[in-house]
Every structure is written in structure tokens, then in C-alpha cells.
Design a protein with these regions (language model features):
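Glycine-rich oxoanion-binding loops at beta->alpha junctions
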Residues: 2-36, 85-136, 144-145, 167, ...
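N-terminal phosphate-binding or glycine-rich loops at protein starts, especially the Walker A/P-loop
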Residues: 33-86
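Short beta-strand segments
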Residues: 46-47, 77-79, 113, 138-140, ...
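Short glycine/serine/threonine-rich phosphate/pyrophosphate-binding segments
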Residues: 52-62, 85-86, 119-124, 141-150
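Short, solvent-exposed amphipathic alpha-helical segments in soluble enzyme
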Residues: 60-64, 93, 129, 152-156
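A generic structural signal for alpha->beta connector loops
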Residues: 72, 108, 161-162
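Short, acidic/small-residue loops that bind anionic groups at enzyme active sites
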Residues: 152-171
């Protein structure tokens, strides 16, 4: 069930003059060869900003995919948005596994709670280092994705091997 790196989605579906499109997108999906060893990594999930339907379903699907399809056994939920990374807020993380998210798709809101507003990017990356997080999934809207981008820039600046992934949600 792996997707080959050779699989592409053409930018232009139809060409009238018979020319081949030069532009294509990489097809999404699981790859046979991946950068991280899933059995050795710790993943993190955070939800930020306003709530919208389906957030718990996204959390559940992430946990199930990471656990069952990739073999990731250490998944942390960071509570109350980006505040969850800042020690002075004293928010505890939540261990996520298939049992803990089994029925969350039937519950409204976010099991991780949420918050709005920026936090210190340096402190967030410090927390990722302390907790040995190698993949961080940020679920949120424009502000969250801007924050995820800033986190990724700081990770790159420090030359860390942490993947920052943005999952858009909005109403």
C-alpha cells in the first residue's frame, strides 16, 4: 500500500496541442522508505485557535495512522494550544494511543483543548527538544499555520531533526 516516488499528479489535466505538461505535484501517501524510524520517534499533536467540527476526528485519525500504519508508540497531545509547550502555564501533556482516542470522534470540541495567541517560539522548540519530539502536528487556522512556520524556522536555525506539519482547519 505504498505510493511510489514516481507517481505524480499532473498540473494540467488536459492539453489540446499534444504537448506534455512540465508541471506536476508529488502524489501524497505512505512511502516505503521514510526519513524517521517510527519505532524510535515521539510525535506530538496540538490544536490551536477556535474550535470547529471534526477536530477530534482529525486527532483520532492521526493517532490511529501513526500507531497502526507506522508503528509510532509515543504520541503526546499538547493541551491548550501553543500554551501547552510553555512551562509557566503548567499544562500537562496527554498520552495518546488507540484506546485513549477510540470514541473521541463522537465528542465535540477538542480533547486537547485549545487557546489563541502567540507564544514564545524559542520556548516551544525548547520543549520539543526536552520531550524528544521528532514530529509535531499543528492543527489550526491561519494563526496556527503561521506559528507552525515560525517553529519550523527555529528548528531549522538550530539544525534540529524535527518535522513540523500543519493541518489546516477553519470554519
Amino acid at each position: 500500500n505504498f505510493v511510489s516516488d514516481e507517481n505524480k499528479i499532473l498540473y494540467e489535466v488536459e492539453k489540446t496541442n499534444g504537448a506534455i505538461s512540465k508541471f506536476a505535484f508529488e502524489k501524497a501517501g505512505p512511502r516505503e522508505k521514510i526519513y524517521y524510524d517510527p519505532s524510535k520517534i515521539r510525535a506530538g499533536i496540538v490544536t490551536c485557535g477556535g474550535l470547529c467540527p471534526g477536530i477530534n476526528n482529525v486527532i483520532r485519525t492521526l493517532v490511529m495512522q501513526l500507531y497502526h500504519n507506522y508503528g509510532v508508540r509515543h504520541i503526546q497531545g499538547f493541551r491548550y494550544g501553543f500554551q501547552g509547550f510553555i512551562p509557566s502555564f503548567k499544562h500537562e501533556t496527554m498520552n495518546l494511543n488507540p484506546e485513549s482516542v477510540q470514541n473521541v470522534h463522537n465528542i465535540g470540541g477538542s480533547i486537547l483543548s485549545s487557546s489563541r495567541g502567540p507564544q514564545d517560539i524559542g520556548e516551544i522548540v525548547d520543549c520539543l527538544e526536552r520531550q524528544d519530539i521528532r514530529q509535531l502536528f499543528c492543527i489550526g487556522g491561519d494563526g496556527t499555520l503561521r506559528g507552525a512556520h515560525e517553529i519550523a524556522l527555529e528548528v531549522e536555525k538550530r539544525n534540529l531533526k524535527i518535522g513540523i506539519l500543519g493541518i489546516p482547519k477553519t470554519i
